[in-house]
Every structure is written in structure tokens, then in C-alpha cells.
Design a protein with these regions (language model features):
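Surface-exposed receptor/substrate recognition regions of extracellular proteins
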Residues: 1-159
Length: 159
């Protein structure tokens, strides 16, 4: 974005204003999807939140898999992916099957996601939780009833 001050003289009077130019050719739209809805009853429930990124109607940095699990899929084919959840972390790990073993490829330039995803939370009044610090990172995160108090809004920032 660029802003310019413009001045113009007309009939002996000077007018000025500021014009802002914004490059809209690279606009992105981020959507947050949930694998298990958006309601937790009495603090019970769990889900994976997925940040899907769109540009000009096409998905950018797409999901590598729709499998989200604590344990690896059985009988995978070489090149298969899944998002591994850890019991003690909200962040998932992108795993790829090499043909003989599962490998963490979250940071891989070849297989990992091209964008950086940072998640934040806000309470029922719109106030930042976690002292404004990031709640989790990654395209896919896992949450449960302990992460929600009455109402919590999850926001994903994409870079």
C-alpha cells in the first residue's frame, strides 16, 4: 500500500487530500474449518482446526492430507501424509511415509507448507487470551474443551 498527498489549485483556491493505492492482485482469504463442529458441551469435546487459504478463488498451500490422528495410519502407501497430534501440544506435525517409515516433514522445503500459520485466542468479550501470545502454530491445530471457556474465538494469522 502506498499513500500520496495530492494538491490542486482551482480558481485561486488550493485543495489537498491523500490518496491510497492498494495492490489487490495478491489478496488472500483465510477460512477456518473444524473437523468436529464448533460447540463443546460442558467442556467436553475435541476438534482439529484447519486454516485454508485462498487466492483468486483457488486454494493456496493446500492440505497434504485429511487424516488427523495421534497414531499413524496403518498400511499407508509411499508418499502418504497425515497430521500427527500430540497429547501435550496443540500444534500438529506433518508426517510423510517414505515407504518404510513415517518422517516429520513439517519444516521440509519440499513437503512442508509454504506459509506460516500462527493461532491466537480471544475470550467471550473479544479480549486476547494467553497474554496476547500465540496459542499454537501450524496449518492444522488440535483443541479440546479445556481450551474453551464459555466462548473462545480462534484467529489464524498467515504470513
Amino acid at each position: 500500500q502506498a499513500s500520496y498527498r495530492c494538491r490542486m489549485a482551482y480558481n485561486g483556491k488550493t485543495y489537498q487530500d491523500v490518496i491510497s493505492l492498494i495492490d489487490k492482485t495478491d489478496n488472500y482469504q483465510a477460512d477456518v474449518d473444524s473437523t468436529a463442529g464448533d460447540v463443546f458441551k460442558n467442556g467436553i469435546g475435541s476438534t482439529f482446526l484447519i486454516c485454508r487459504l485462498w487466492q483468486n478463488g483457488k486454494e493456496v498451500d493446500a492440505l497434504k492430507s485429511t487424516t488427523y490422528s495421534v497414531s499413524a495410519p496403518t498400511a499407508p502407501s509411499a508418499g502418504a501424509f497425515y497430521y500427527k497430534a500430540a497429547a501435550n501440544s496443540h500444534t500438529t506435525t506433518l508426517m510423510r511415509y517414505s515407504g518404510s517409515a513415517w518422517t516429520d516433514v513439517s519444516s521440509s522445503a519440499e513437503y512442508g507448507h509454504t506459509k506460516k500459520y500462527t493461532w491466537y485466542r480471544r475470550d467471550k468479550n473479544g479480549e486476547p487470551l494467553d497474554n496476547g501470545a500465540a496459542f499454537a502454530t501450524g496449518k492444522v491445530i488440535s483443541i479440546n474443551g479445556d481450551d474453551v471457556d464459555v466462548k473462545t474465538v480462534f484467529v489464524c494469522e498467515v504470513e
